Regions:
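Early extracytoplasmic/lumenal segment of secretory-pathway proteins
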Residues: 4, 18-159, 309
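A structural signal for short loop-to-beta-strand junctions that line the ligand-binding cleft
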Residues: 122-151, 163, 167-212, 231, ...
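Ligand-binding pocket segment of bilobal, Venus flytrap-like solute-binding proteins
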Residues: 130, 259, 263-339, 385-386
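Periplasmic-binding protein-like
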Residues: 179, 184-187, 207, 244-245, 288-294, 377-402, ...
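A bilobed periplasmic-binding-protein/Venus flytrap-type ligand-binding module shared by bacterial periplasmic
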Residues: 212-217, 354-369, 386-387
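Conserved C-terminal helix/tail region of periplasmic/extracytoplasmic solute-binding proteins
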Residues: 426-542
Length: 542
C-alpha cells in the first residue's frame, strides 16, 4: 500500500491537473481590477513547471517593476490537442474578421487558404483571388484568440503552426542579439533546429528520448540490466512488460519513434554497401519492424506520457519509452533516504538527438507586452537556471527540481554546473553521437504517427497474439518472414501515398487508415496460424 501511495503521489506531482487550477485573480482583487496584468499561456507542460515558472516570474516582476502579474495556464492536453484548439480558435476569429469587419463572403476556398502553410502567395496582390486574398490578409492582420504564448512541446508542431501563420516574431532577438550567438544559443545542433530562422519560435530547454528501467522487474524476468538500446524494448522476454504512450496524442511521443527510424537508417547508410536512397528505404523497413516488435511487447499505449515512468517504477511494467524529463523527475521523486531510486533513466547511445521545447508569441496576443517580458525572463540566465537547478540553490525552484536542461550553452560551466541537478549530463558534448536528418523523415512525421496507429494501436490484440505465437513456437522462419512484411508501409509509400492521404479531409484519412489496419490484422492472424502450424524445431533470428 505504501509503495502504491508513493507512486500515486509521484504521478500526481508530475501530471497536469488543470481542472483543479483556479485562476488566482478570481481570489485576488488587486489582479481582478487589471486584466492587463494577466498573461494567457497555452501549454502541455506539467503542473510542476507551470507552478515554478509562475512563482519565479511573478517574483521577478515584483522585484524589477513593482508589478503584480498572474499567469493563466490553459492545458487542453498534449501538442496535438493544442494544435486542434489553435486551428478552431483562429478559424473562428478570422471568419469573424473576414465577415464582420471586412464585409466579405466566407467560402470554403477562403477557409482552406487562410492558414494553409503550403499556400504559395505571389509577391504582388493585384491579381489575388479570394483564396490568395484570405491568406495575405491573415498574415497581415492582428487577429487573435485571447492567448499570448504557446509554451512547450516539440519543434515540429511549432514549425507547423508558424507556417500556418499563428506564431509571430516577438522581437526578442532584436533586443538581445547576443543571446542568439553560436556561443549561447546556436541555431542548429546535431541536425535539430534550436530556433526558427524568422524567430517565430525559440527553443528554451532541451529534450532527449530514452528508456526508463525498473531493475527489480528485470531481475524478476531474469534479464541482466543492459546498456540501454532501443532494441531492448523488442526483447521477447519483455512481452507485455513495455510501457508506451500513444503517438497520436503527442508530437513528442511521435518524435521518439522517429529517433528509432533515424538510427536504423543511419546504421544501414554507414554500412556503405547501398546508395543513399536504397539505404534509407532499408533502414526505414528495419526501423518499422523494430517499432512493431516494441508495439507487440507493449502492455498498453497510454494517453499521457507521465503514466509510463509511474507504472515502470511501480513494477506494472519493466521498461518504458519516455522523454528525459519524465524519467529524471520520477527518478528524483522516488529516491530513498540513501539516494537510491527504483527507477533508472538512460538515453540509448547514438539513439536520440537533442531537440528543443520552444516558446512562441501568438498572433494577436492580447497582452504582448507582458508576453515579451515572460520570454525575456525565460531566456535570461535567471530563467534558464530554473530548468535544472536543485531545490534550495540560489535561483533554483522552490518545491521541485524540474530536471530539464537549459538551452543556453553558457550555463554548462562553473559556477552554474555546481547547482545543476544533472551536472554530468552535458548535451552539447554528446551532440555529435546522433545527427538528426530532417530530409530523411521530416516530411514523414505525420505519416509516422498515422502508420503506428494503423499497424500497432488499432490491431494491437492481433499484433500481440501473433508475437506470442512466434515466441511460443521459437520463431519459425516462414512466420517471421510473414511478420516482417512491411510492403504496405515502405519508405516510398510513407512519403508518397500516405503523405497525400494526410492532406485530404479527415473522413478520407480515416477510411484509408481502417483499410491499412485491416490489412495488418489479417497479416498478424496469418502469422499466428503459420507459427502454430510449425513444429518449432527450426528457429530463426528475431
Amino acid at each position: 500500500v505504501i509503495r502504491f501511495l508513493s507512486i500515486l503521489g509521484a504521478l500526481v506531482a508530475v501530471l497536469a491537473v488543470p481542472f483543479l487550477l483556479k485562476p488566482e485573480y478570481e481570489h485576488d482583487p488587486r489582479l481582478a481590477k487589471s486584466q492587463s496584468q494577466i498573461l494567457n499561456i497555452i501549454t502541455p507542460h506539467s503542473e510542476s513547471i507551470r507552478r515554478e515558472f509562475t512563482t519565479a516570474f511573478r517574483k521577478h516582476m515584483r522585484e524589477t517593476e513593482g508589478r503584480e502579474v498572474f499567469i493563466e495556464w490553459r492545458v487542453p492536453g498534449g501538442t496535438s490537442e493544442i494544435e486542434k484548439v489553435l486551428d478552431t480558435e483562429y478559424t473562428f476569429a478570422f471568419q469573424n474578421h473576414w465577415k464582420n469587419q471586412l464585409g466579405r463572403n466566407w467560402t470554403s476556398a477562403v477557409e482552406a487558404a487562410f492558414n494553409n502553410r503550403k499556400f504559395s502567395l505571389p509577391k504582388e496582390s493585384a491579381n489575388d483571388g479570394s483564396a490568395e486574398s484570405a491568406r495575405r490578409t491573415f498574415l497581415q492582420a492582428n487577429v487573435g484568440v485571447g492567448i499570448d504564448l504557446f509554451f512547450g512541446g516539440g519543434a515540429y508542431p511549432f514549425a507547423v503552426n508558424a507556417g500556418k501563420g499563428y506564431l509571430v516574431d516577438s522581437g526578442l532577438a532584436v533586443k538581445h542579439p547576443d543571446w542568439f550567438a553560436e556561443s549561447v544559443i546556436p541555431q542548429e545542433v546535431g541536425g535539430e533546429p534550436f530556433y526558427d530562422s524568422g524567430y517565430r519560435w525559440l527553443g528554451c530547454c532541451l529534450s532527449t528520448f530514452g528508456i526508463c528501467v525498473n531493475d527489480d522487474a528485470l531481475d524478476r524476468l531474469g534479464i541482466e540490466a543492459p546498456t540501454p538500446d532501443w532494441a531492448l524494448l523488442a526483447d521477447p522476454r519483455l512481452f507485455k512488460e513495455v510501457a508506451l504512450a500513444d503517438p497520436t496524442a503527442s508530437g513528442t511521443v511521435t518524435k521518439a519513434f522517429e529517433m528509432i527510424l533515424q538510427q536504423q537508417m543511419r546504421r544501414v547508410l554507414d554500412r556503405g554497401d547501398l546508395d543513399e536512397r536504397a539505404a534509407l528505404s532499408e533502414g526505414w523497413a528495419t526501423g518499422m519492424n523494430l517499432i512493431r516488435r516494441i508495439g507487440a511487447n507493449a502492455r498498453y499505449y497510454a494517453n499521457f506520457s507521465a503514466k509510463i515512468p509511474a507504472d515502470v517504477a511501480a513494477g506494472e511494467a519493466a521498461v518504458g519509452m519516455c522523454i528525459d524529463y519524465y524519467g529524471r523527475t520520477f527518478n528524483e521523486l522516488l529516491r530513498d533516504e540513501e539516494g537510491r531510486s527504483r527507477l533508472r533513466f538512460a538515453t540509448p547511445v547514438g539513439g536520440s538527438s537533442t531537440s528543443v521545447d520552444p516558446i512562441a508569441m501568438l498572433r494577436g496576443a492580447p497582452n504582448s507586452e507582458l508576453a515579451f517580458k515572460f520570454m525575456e525572463f525565460l531566456f535570461s540566465k535567471k530563467g534558464q537556471q530554473l530548468w535544472d537547478y536543485r531545490v534550495g540553490t540560489n535561483g533554483g525552484p522552490e518545491r521541485q527540481a524540474l530536471r530539464r536542461l537549459p538551452v543556453r550553452k553558457d550555463l554548462y560551466v562553473e559556477p552554474y554546473l555546481t547547482n545543476f541537478a544533472d551536472p554530468k549530463v552535458l548535451p552539447f558534448e554528446r551532440a555529435d553521437l546522433f545527427r538528426y536528418e530532417v530530409a530523411w523523415t521530416g516530411r514523414a512525421f505525420g505519416a509516422i504517427r498515422y502508420i503506428i496507429k494503423s499497424v500497432c494501436l488499432d490491431p494491437h490484440d492481433e499484433l500481440r497474439a501473433a508475437w506470442q505465437a512466434l515466441i511460443d513456437h521459437d520463431f519459425p522462419p516462414d512466420a517471421v518472414a510473414a511478420f516482417d512484411d512491411v510492403s504496405r508501409i515502405t519508405y516510398e509509400i510513407a512519403l508518397g501515398e500516405i503523405a497525400d492521404v494526410l492532406k485530404r479531409p479527415s473522413r478520407e484519412q480515416s477510411l484509408y487508415g481502417r483499410g491499412l489496419s485491416e490489412h495488418f490484422r489479417e497479416q498478424y492472424r496469418r502469422v499466428e496460424v503459420l507459427a502454430k502450424a510449425s513444429d518449432g524445431r527450426v528457429t530463426s533470428s528475431h
